[in-house]
């Protein structure tokens, strides 16, 4: 009994720390809006921009997750497959963006894309969409494409650590003899077959988990959308 009670106390405290802020936030939201979250969802189509905002949020979260996984997989591969000096420092540096406050990250990207910023100085004007970015926007016919690109890059930078932390341990702990044995099979002679028949089944769960978590964080992002795409809504 004492052991069970001793285990239940920290679990209860942990759940309280997670659920209490959420309950207070929902209560505050209901007080301000005058309706509960379920009513807000049911009446979403009554807002003039409600459906468009949800569609934009869903699309940018999907694109952010795809971009993050695309950039994170090679880094996770290099960290897991090869030996690096001071790999702990490298992992810590790659994890740093994820623990950076979103407002700080937004200010950093605003400094990059502002007039006279680093990207602007090399001809990439994501802020005012002139030059190359303006021509690209006219070709694809998407308004505020520069803001969207900045937002996707910020989400990828912010969530890159998720992909690395999910995928890299799986790669680094896989015994090399498994791949050597697969190479001896007829289906393992080509790199494409090894990728689709060996590595994908091994890493599928980790990759999909990283994709889902990145999508969730991008979908619920507010500060980055507020500061990097202020003209969208």
Regions found by a protein language model. Give the residues of each.
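Polar/charged alpha-helical tracts
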Residues: 39, 121-124, 183
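Generic anion/oxyanion-binding catalytic loop in active/binding sites
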Residues: 42-43, 192, 226
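General structural signal for secondary-structure boundaries
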Residues: 37, 46-47, 185-188
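Short hydrophobic, aromatic-rich alpha-helical segments embedded in or entering the lipid bilayer
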Residues: 35-42, 231-233
